[in-house]
């Protein structure tokens, strides 16, 4: 065992794994109301709840370096590493070595072990919450206390410290996620919307600030005070544009200018509103009314107390401002996802049909090739049968020619096959000449 492993015994009173006698343990004998019940070993052991580990187990505390090692158990013969002791024992059987080397060094009974986390602030650092599996404590330490993300997804750039988590993520990544314009993929709609808000906020923050509107459109007005803002000679100009360049004290301005300046200040900060001052519907001809007022009351030209300002103030949001609605965006996202899912299903179905057609085509081509081979083989067999038939006919003809008796030869010729080809005839003639020569030699001797 390595030096960085510290074996702690539960018999020590300093550890918190010791269960007091007053605590209720389902595996201890209890006496209530005069009835004594004892759970024997023949009964089925129930699973212990969290916080009550096996009192006979040994508490093992491994260092972070040991927990981050990928292969803990190493074969002495081939130096191959394994994560579990059982895998090492199975591997040792492949080496044809004596049984003594396969046995353990000591015949001491192996006790059950529980593993604690080396991080002091972790819940599993307490022996009461120790983990009973070495692989489990390794995965826990890599997930919670390790910053080394060894496996990174190529689609969403999400890193994982445990390979099993990375493989599980690859099965679902991109199938049911929400992709942003920046390239990130989210599996939850809430996280995706929050990221979209942050991205849009960053874009708005990066845009150059718009200059505040410095002009207010004032249509034809019935009062003389609204038309004499800049100079007294502009009495006949009832409609125009008032340029607001520098702020002026509000006390020396008329009431409609105070309202317009305050609204301009608020609009530049909030919603960029457009301000319009419209006359009342009763004032159909403001020029004629102002001329009559000049003739009848010339002394009231500089007296603003007798003048009345009848204005209609309409405030509307700017057309360039677009209100951001999360609900509409969610509906659009969900609709686009549904369309994308349907398109993906149709694409998968088309690909499957294409693969099936390709497979059927390959099967047909193979059957056609087999049929051609069978046809060629049949033709070869037919040619061979014809050749054998011709050979047999030639042998029969040669046998008939060897018969010396004319009577028997006539009988055989009566039932013989019709005349053969020119080659067969020449062959028969040669056989006849050879037969006659043999007969003459026999008669001569």
From Swiss-Prot:
- Tell me the keywords, alphabetical order: Coiled coil, DNA-binding, Metal-binding, Nucleus, Repeat, Transcription, Transcription regulation, Zinc, Zinc-finger
Which InterPro entries does the UniProt entry name for this protein? C2CH-3rd_BIRD-IDD (IPR055187), C2CH-4th_BIRD-IDD (IPR055185), C2H2-2nd_BIRD-IDD (IPR055186), IDD1-16 (IPR031140), Znf_C2H2_sf (IPR036236), Znf_C2H2_type (IPR013087)
* Keyword Nucleotide-binding found: no
Which regions form coiled coils?
340-397
- Point out which parts of the chain are CCHC-type zinc fingers, as ranges: 178-201
Expression induction per the record is: Not regulated by auxin.
**Residue spans with biased composition (Polar residues)?**
32-42, 214-248
Q: Per UniProt, where does Zn(2+) 1 bind?
A: 153, 156, 169, 173
Task: Give the UniProt subcellular location, in the record's own words.
Answer: Nucleus
Task: List the protein's name.
Answer: Zinc finger protein SHOOT GRAVITROPISM 5
Q: Which organism is it from?
A: Arabidopsis thaliana
Q: Gene of origin?
A: SGR5
